[in-house]
Amino acid sequence: MINPDYLIDYSDWFDEGGYCQVYPIKDKKDLVFKEFRNKKKAQESYRYHKKLAKFDLAPKIYSKICKLEFAKEDDLYQPEPSDWGYVTELARTHTANTKISMADIQHLVDEIYKKTGLKFWDCHWYNVGMVKRGKNKKVVCIDTGKESFDGNSNAWANPDPGPKCSYCEKYECDCCD
């Protein structure tokens, strides 16, 4: 089903991860479309995303699973409609060790587990972002694919999810080497 309420702004930026691409939405600077390679991947991500967003641990969701048309641009190739995905609030990502600290990531990991029972294993800097909540910024999970929660994508190689060592409680240590 093509959602007529939004258009992908193909002339602007886009970003990609291992399982999805993220496109800006035309005339909606704070919304993006997360596109997946198939409907099953989109549905899996949507389920996790919805569970996290319920507790404000992921960007807000603005659509159900759908496809979108690309906005028409003069003198540019007009792609076919997108693959399956959904519209969410834009979360800004940052370079590692800049605006989002290891403590921020660990707090998010702990909140996700406390509120949903999920273990956010793939919690590296490029799988988290910041959203605005009033005048404040909040760190949220932006990779909601099932691989982020299955334990096979352990971003920090600790026995528990997150950058804090489970043994010495430090963020950078040698006790596991």
Language-model segments: residues:
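Short, solvent-exposed loop/turn segments at secondary-structure junctions
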Residues: K28, N38-K40, C66-K67, A91-T93, ...
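Conserved structural core of kinase catalytic domains
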Residues: R37, A53-I105
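Catalytic activation segment of kinase domains across protein kinase-like and atypical kinase folds
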Residues: W121-D174
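Protein kinase-like catalytic core scaffold
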Residues: L31, L57, Y86, K138-V140
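Active-site-adjacent loop/helix micro-motif of nuclease/hydrolase catalytic cores
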Residues: K39-R47, A96-A103, D150-N152
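Active-site beta-strand termini and strand-to-loop segments that position acidic
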Residues: P24-K28, L90, V131
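ATP-binding glycine-rich loop module of kinase domains
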Residues: D5-P59
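Protein kinase catalytic-loop region centered on the HRD/HxD motif
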Residues: D110-L118
